[in-house]
A protein has these predicted regions:
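Small-residue-enriched transmembrane helix starts and helix-helix packing motifs
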Residues: 157-162
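N-terminal signal peptide c-region/cleavage motif recognized by signal peptidases
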Residues: 16-18
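Non-catalytic, surface beta->alpha helical segment in thiol-disulfide oxidoreductase systems
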Residues: 89-128, 132
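Thiol-based oxidoreductase modules, predominantly thioredoxin-like and allied folds used
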Residues: 53-68
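Thiol/disulfide oxidoreductase modules built on the thioredoxin-like
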Residues: 73-83, 94-100
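Local sequence-structure signature of Cys/Sec-based thiol-disulfide redox active-site neighborhoods
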Residues: 21-53
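Bacterial N-terminal signal peptides
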Residues: 5-14
Length: 162
């Protein structure tokens, strides 16, 4: 169990500080939380299609194996108690969700883009507004940019490699 906690803590830190902070969003959610559904729909179902370099990691906090990772994220975010969703993007942490956060995330993501990338994102956003289903169908590979975190899979991976 200590090994799992240690691995989860390390992975939790790497999720928060991964590569370029503006290219990674981590959502800590519960399947029974209505605001989590809104957050996941907007981020995993919209932003990931608008921003070709965005990766979204979703962490189901109702899975006990993911508890240490969630607790580490709360600690790093300076949150004293739980609650979901918790959304980590860049150096920002948000607990709860409203559509207003979507604009803030776009602003943060846009800050690291060059003009060509901004033009592409604007074009993608317009296409999503015109016909999201058609755009998603043409860009189905973007579904791979949404990762489901599993602490148990991380713990089992070294054993399977042997």
């Amino acid at each position: 169990m200590k090994k799992l906690s240690f691995l989860s803590a390390i992975l939790g830190l790497s999720l928060i500080n991964a590569a370029s902070a503006s290219e990674v969003i981590t959502i800590y959610y519960s399947p029974s939380c209505p605001y989590c559904h809104y957050a996941r729909n907007d981020i995993s179902g919209r932003l990931v299609y608008e921003y070709p370099n965005l990766t979204v990691t979703e962490v189901d906090v109702s899975n006990p194996d993911n508890g240490p990772t969630y607790l580490e994220a709360l600690k790093r975010c300076g949150l004293k108690s739980g609650g979901v969703p918790v959304i980590v993007y860049g150096d920002k942490c948000e607990r709860g969700y409203s559509g207003l956060l979507l604009d803030g995330m776009r602003e943060l993501l846009n800050a690291s883009l060059n003009e060509e990338e901004k033009t592409l994102v604007a074009s993608n956003r317009k296409a999503m507004e015109e016909d999201a289903d058609a755009f998603k169908a043409r860009n189905a590979d973007r579904k791979k940019a949404v990762l489901q975190f599993s602490a148990k899979a991380i713990e089992e991976a070294p054993a399977q490699a042997q």
